[in-house]
UniProtKB/Swiss-Prot annotation:
Enzyme Commission number: 7.1.1.-
Membrane topology value: Multi-pass membrane protein
Domain of life: Bacteria
Self-association state and partner proteins as the record states: NDH-1 can be composed of about 15 different subunits; different subcomplexes with different compositions have been identified which probably have different functions.
UniProt function note: NDH-1 shuttles electrons from an unknown electron donor, via FMN and iron-sulfur (Fe-S) centers, to quinones in the respiratory and/or the photosynthetic chain. The immediate electron acceptor for the enzyme in this species is believed to be plastoquinone. Couples the redox reaction to proton translocation, and thus conserves the redox energy in a proton gradient. Cyanobacterial NDH-1 also plays a role in inorganic carbon-concentration.
Protein localization: Cellular thylakoid membrane
Classification via PANTHER family: NADH-UBIQUINONE OXIDOREDUCTASE CHAIN 3
Designated name of the protein: NAD(P)H-quinone oxidoreductase subunit 3
InterPro entries per the UniProt record, alphabetical: NAD(P)H_OxRDtase_bac/plastid, NADH_UbQ/plastoQ_OxRdtase_su3, NDAH_ubi_oxred_su3_sf
Membrane spanning stretches: 15-35, 79-99, 104-124
Length: 135
């Protein structure tokens, strides 16, 4: 099928691609999507099936399980994890800035100072609210 543009140029639809040169990327993407699916299907087909009650037990490093698997734990773990994630993400954002510091100039330095100041205020707030104290 042949189309004609407003400029009079004829384009053959069978050879027209939106992103020419990305064939290798598309192939890689398809393979990357197929490998985990293939691994899961292969596992499902080849894995031994055991109907014993031992299979349903919670694994505790080779020891006999004691009690149930559903236990309560202190909610403060979430607060520590949240504070850790916040400051971990901070380092992820600051690392590229530090690598390119000499090329970015004064404006980027001021922006980084504002970013660090906001995070320090958040840390002070969490500290003041007792989020970092274990009792």
């Amino acid at each position: 099928m042949v189309y004609e543009c407003q400029t009079g140029v004829q384009i053959e639809a069978a050879l027209m691609f939106v992103l020419p040169g990305y064939d290798a990327f598309l192939g890689f993407l398809l393979i990357a999507a197929a490998v985990p699916v293939l691994a899961l299907v292969t596992n499902k087909l080849l894995a031994p099936r055991s109907q014993t009650g031992e299979r349903e037990l919670t694994y505790e490093s080779g020891m006999e399980p004691i009690g149930g698997a559903w236990i309560q734990f202190n909610i403060r773990y979430y607060m520590f994890a949240l504070v850790f994630v916040i400051f971990d993400v901070e380092t992820v954002f600051l690392y590229p800035w530090a690598v390119a510091f000499h090329r970015l100039g004064l404006l980027a330095f001021i922006e980084a100072l504002v970013f660090i100041t906001i995070l320090l205020v958040a840390l002070a707030y969490a500290w003041r609210k007792g989020a970092l104290e274990w009792s």
